[in-house]
Amino acid sequence: MADASIPKPGEEKEATPCPSILQLEELLRAGRASCSRVDEVWPNLFIGDAATANNRFELWKLGITHVLNAAHGGLYCQGGPDFYGSSVCYLGIPAHDLPDFNISPYFSSAADFIHRALTVPGAKVLVHCVVGVSRSATLVLAYLMLHQQLSLQQAIITVRERRWIFPNRGFLRQLCQLDQQLRGAGQS
């Protein structure tokens, strides 16, 4: 399938420019993927919506030990340390799903939170926003790029095989910038 033409981590010989936003959007539209409230997109890493995050019983059934809320302080997101208690580790990121919102300052802290959590045996991480399509997906893509050494294209394909995602254009631009920084593209 599409994976055959995508180089595996460490196989890329030289830095390549990030695909255009339109090409990335086509990649995001390709194929079929789940539209569930929550999906496991990487081992023990889930993307979900606010309804799932606000349902402590559902989180317990899933075995979620860590929650990253990409819509912290938002109208529909109740989460926080007081809401989850001591049974769940929580990180809130006050991102707005707007193309001009700069989410990139949160890439590193979000990716590090996910990475640290996934090194704990038995840990499971839920990354959510309101719908689980743009903000949360953006932070998961950044994690896959920063800690799993996937290119942006590889990260999108990996997540899209398991969940329908569609980061807004501003977030895609910021992910492209991260991809270029990580791959050394665009430097003289």
UniProtKB/Swiss-Prot annotation:
Annotated GO CC locations: cytoplasm
Localisation: Cytoplasm
The enzyme's E.C. designation: 3.1.3.16, 3.1.3.48
Reactions performed catalytically: O-phospho-L-tyrosyl-[protein] + H2O = L-tyrosyl-[protein] + phosphate; O-phospho-L-seryl-[protein] + H2O = L-seryl-[protein] + phosphate; O-phospho-L-threonyl-[protein] + H2O = L-threonyl-[protein] + phosphate
Gene3D superfamilies recorded: Protein tyrosine phosphatase superfamily
Top-rank lineage group of the source organism: Eukaryota
Residues forming the catalytic site: C129
Keywords of this entry: Cytoplasm, Hydrolase, Protein phosphatase
Main location group: cytoplasm
GO molecular function terms listed in the Swiss-Prot or TrEMBL record: protein serine/threonine phosphatase activity; protein tyrosine phosphatase activity; protein tyrosine/serine/threonine phosphatase activity
Domain Tyrosine-protein phosphatase: start-end pairs: 37-184
Tissue expression notes: Skeletal muscle-specific.
SUPFAM superfamilies the UniProt entry points to: (Phosphotyrosine protein) phosphatases II
Function text: Probable protein tyrosine phosphatase. Has phosphatase activity with synthetic substrates. Has a phosphatase activity-independent regulatory role in MAP3K5/ASK1-mediated apoptosis, preventing MAP3K5/ASK1 inhibition by AKT1. Shows no phosphatase activity on MAPK1/ERK2, MAPK8/JNK, MAPK14/p38 and MAP3K5/ASK1.
PANTHER family linked: AGAP008228-PA, DUAL SPECIFICITY PROTEIN PHOSPHATASE
Protein family according to the UniProt entry: Belongs to the protein-tyrosine phosphatase family. Non-receptor class dual specificity subfamily.
Subunit structure of this chain's protein: Monomer. Interacts with MAP3K5/ASK1; may compete with AKT1 preventing MAP3K5/ASK1 phosphorylation by AKT1.
Protein name per its UniProtKB record: Dual specificity protein phosphatase 13A
